[in-house]
A protein has these predicted regions:
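Charge-rich, low-complexity N-terminal segments
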Residues: 1-47
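Conserved short hydrophobic interaction patches
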Residues: 16-19, 80-88, 120-134
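Short beta-strand micro-motifs enriched in acidic
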Residues: 27, 53-55, 94-96
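Hydrophobic residues embedded in beta-strands of well-ordered beta-sheets
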Residues: 32-34, 59-60, 100-101
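Long, continuous compositionally biased terminal/linker segments
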Residues: 40-67
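Short, internal acidic amphipathic alpha-helical interface segments
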Residues: 63-104
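Well-ordered alpha/beta subsegment
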Residues: 95-122, 130-143
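Short, highly charged C-terminal tails/helix-capping segments
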Residues: 136-172
Length: 172
């Protein structure tokens, strides 16, 4: 990133992830696009898979693998995703080609920095937590949420750092 070119490079984004206490599980480079796989924890929902995509033609996208492919009555699921799009600003719910519900955030380069990335990740995690009961049927057999008593999340500092920017989701 330079004053004449505000587009962050892959090493800059990797530096932001380190500063946020996040270690990618994989990196994929394809042409000019770089993607990192992450596994993060919400306060209530754990092991949430993300892909962070840096596309020099677009910006940065955080993409949450929200649930496995939907197998129930699709109409009801589509209605739920559309309702969530109305209820949660700044994010978009959609279906991947394989039928998996996804949750994404697009950050244009003009505002992209470490904190915008951190807020996007924290917001997505908080939404996953808020929708835990409603999405349990997609996530676990019989919709039974596993007992997670005593489990500690791997990235609580992310919530602490951005709680003041997400009071409606993080209760600050």
């Amino acid at each position: 990133m330079s004053p004449s070119d505000p587009t962050p490079t892959a090493p800059v984004v990797e530096g932001w992830l380190v500063e946020l206490g996040i270690k990618p599980t994989a990196r994929v480079d394809r042409d000019d696009v770089v993607a990192w796989d992450l596994q993060l924890d919400g306060r209530r929902r754990f092991d949430i898979r993300f892909t962070v995509i840096l596309d020099p033609a677009l910006g940065l996208i955080t993409w949450v693998h929200f649930a496995p492919p939907i197998g129930d009555g699709l109409r009801k699921s589509y209605q739920r995703l559309l309702r969530w799009n109305d209820e949660f600003p700044f994010v978009k719910f959609s279906l991947a080609e394989d039928g998996r519900p996804t949750l994404s955030t697009e950050i244009p380069f003009r505002i992209l920095d470490r904190d915008e990335l951190g807020v996007a990740l924290a917001r997505s995690l908080a939404i996953c937590d808020a929708l835990l009961e409603e999405s349990a049927g997609w996530l676990w057999i019989g919709g039974r949420i596993p007992d997670l008593a005593g489990r500690v999340g791997r990235n609580p500092e992310l919530f602490e750092r951005y709680a003041s920017r997400l009071p409606e989701l993080l209760g600050s």
